[in-house]
A protein has these predicted regions:
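Conserved catalytic motifs of ABC-family nucleotide-binding domains
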Residues: 193
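ABC ATPase NBD coupling module
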Residues: 103-119, 143, 149, 263-267
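Catalytic Walker B motif of ABC-type/P-loop ATPase nucleotide-binding domains
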Residues: 197-200
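Conserved ABC ATPase signature
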Residues: 172-176, 180
Length: 285
């Protein structure tokens, strides 16, 4: 997305993501080796916490406009990958690139500029408790500037409509269900006009019906607005609906990187063992 102010008229309301015309699962798209313009690149990234290696020599890339789902058991570094991409953690070795810029050596002010293009939807939503839902979604718009207040109101209303939360605009986050808070957090993330959206376990602690609806929201928004997505999840049904490509982490390493269909059909014993686990019983990472 460019740096112009968000045009309220360009945000179209979707159909019900749970309805019969909900978007189909993403088509299989093989990663393109040497893609000249990947949005995100990890090159030989390693990180340890104390004496415990978390990620070792992990490499992958995400093409512009595609969705990568990061899968793996508890404690393999899925969420750590997102935090490094946001600049909250620095790798011990290797490099991370966003739109061709290496971010691993950036100062905090430089990282703040990157975070205007890359935003993260946290597990807990990270909403401001003292602000209403509308005020939370409006916050990045007001920080960014460039819109009249009437335009801010219009954009907020349309974003809340996009995620099905238009009826809770005046509520405080604490009064909302987990699923509603996640939906509002997605709306707030989008108000920052990101090029890349990171989702950290969006279906944790929600029932399958809400998980399906969140998946429909995420997929439809990506389709309409064209941003790149990275989704950390333990929910295979959720991943099947969203993923263009899959990164499977095992024992701190990139055990598989490729199209979802290839992952699901793999006869690799480690992948089969993961697929045969009850995904809804996996602990949070």
């Amino acid at each position: 997305m460019d740096d112009e102010a968000l045009n309220p008229e360009e945000i179209a309301l979707p159909q019900d993501p749970s309805g019969p015309e909900a978007a189909e699962p993403a088509a299989e798209v093989a990663p393109v080796p040497g893609d000249p313009e990947p949005t995100i690149v990890f090159r030989n990234v390693s990180i340890s916490f104390g004496d415990r290696p978390v990620l070792e020599d992990v490499s992958f890339s995400v093409e512009r406009g595609k969705t990568l789902c990061i899968l793996g058991r508890s404690g393999v570094g899925k969420s750590v990958s997102l935090r490094m991409l946001m600049g909250f953690l620095k790798p011990d070795s290797g490099s991370i690139h966003v739109d061709g810029q290496e971010i691993t050596g950036m100062s905090e002010p430089e990282l703040q500029a990157v975070r205007k293009r890359v935003t993260m939807v946290f597990q807990n939503g990270a909403l401001f408790d003292s602000l209403t839902v509308k005020e939370n979604v409006a916050f990045p718009l007001r920080e960014r500037g460039g819109l009249e207040e009437s335009q801010v109101v219009q954009v907020v209303d349309r974003l809340l409509g996009l995620v099905g939360a238009e009826d809770v605009g005046d509520a405080l986050p604490a009064s909302l269900s987990t699923g509603r808070r996640r939906a509002v957090a997605i709306a707030r993330a989008l108000s920052a006009q990101p090029e890349v959206v990171l989702y950290d376990e969006p279906t944790t602690m929600v029932d399958p019906i809400i998980a399906k609806r969140l998946g429909g929201i995420i997929q439809r928004l990506k389709s309409q607005l064209g941003f790149t997505s990275i989704v950390v999840t333990h929910d295979m049904r959720f991943a099947e609906r969203l993923a263009d490509v899959v990164l499977f982490l095992d024992n701190g390493r990139a055990h598989f990187f490729g199209p979802l269909k290839q992952f699901m059909a793999s006869e690799d014993p480690d992948i089969q063992q993961f697929l045969n686990l009850d995904a809804y019983e996996l602990p949070n990472v």
